[in-house]
Amino acid sequence: VIEGTIRAISERTRAKVRDGIRRVAEGVSAAHDAQVIIEFHDGYPVTVNNPGSADFALDVAAEVVGAKSTVRLPNPVMGAEDFSYVLNRVPGAMVFLSGTGTDRDPATAAPNHSNRVMFDEAAMVNGVAVYSAMALRHLSGPPS
């Protein structure tokens, strides 16, 4: 039995990975005159941000906490996330809030799910301010 998780940045890539696993498993099975049973169980869908929503979130965050405190991640994150169900139905963006204190570099600080993480609870103030500003801006409608 081989088990694992497939994480991808698009459904197309996920399908290609599944096809590749199937081909390799069937090839190895045939080479050894063995039987293979392949089962895939869908987990969370791929999490894909709406570009306009991501721009909106970044703009609002920059206004609230300053452009130096915001960053657009250069590469997609392949987390398994239940928020992906929301993004499959409603345009939106997954926004990360750093819990790193101002005394540490976020680029080298331990990630949030690490056993070495050191949260600065003052970061929650920024999170509440940013999310509140996004909600208020969204509810006020597009600029005229």
Each model region followed by its residue ranges:
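Metal-dependent amide/peptide-bond hydrolase catalytic core
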Residues: 1-144
